[in-house]
């Protein structure tokens, strides 16, 4: 079996770069002391940043205990993320080529697709460990980096038009190991928690459980959304193991490749006057009748009259519905 922690492979994966724009965004958020959610989103936008943050957070004495980026961000000192981003290698997608481009961007895009679909699957399955699932999904293909570092022709040897399961079988035949197992070895070498390592290692097992099952479903959905073949029977089977019934799985498939949202005709007539729109904008800001009256130089009774007309014209019953309706139609 290949040793993913040996010389060439280990160092190459350790130096895997973040997209320049991802790195710049993290630095900007960290330097202005963004809140935890903003920092988590900035880190999770890139697998290289995710690896770097988790490795840093899982050093002694916390080794093996930090399961997610959110936990890591809460654990690390305020200036740590800025220092980490400054030290992280980057690549410019349109700039000079290095050994990872364009493979690095393909890896990042697939990782983020699986990450977001894993969060959606976790939500549908009613799971409460979404942060850990998102982290496992972001890192699920780490072993592919090790294989690509050791075997430059890796992508050409493994048929791109095969299903995920067929590609894993080819890896085992060509290299004696699959990328899931190699990824688990790498994750353990960085002192990541055992549950996270197992999810990375086992997402291509015949019968994955727990987080690995959620990642496996998300991985197949991401391949399907990208136009790659998958085994539908395998998707249904692993969906069951992830506690995702057929209706829930069908709903996610319906949303692919991206969640749908209503698009309103910009020419659709707004039934409100400009004064009434000013009032709705004030409602959106959380202002009450007296505040709106003072701001617009009107009496409170006039504001109440305007509100009655606004509700009637929009067909709503209260201020919250008025703000929602006007926002959805793009009138604000």
Predicted regions and their residues:
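Recognition helix of helix-turn-helix DNA-binding domains
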Residues: 286-321
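Regulatory hinge/linker segments at domain boundaries
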Residues: 260-281
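Basic, Lys/Arg-enriched C-terminal extension of HTH/homeodomain DNA-binding domains
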Residues: 266-267, 312-332
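Conserved alpha-helical "signature site"
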Residues: 1-154, 167-229, 331
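Short, structured interface segments
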Residues: 244-263
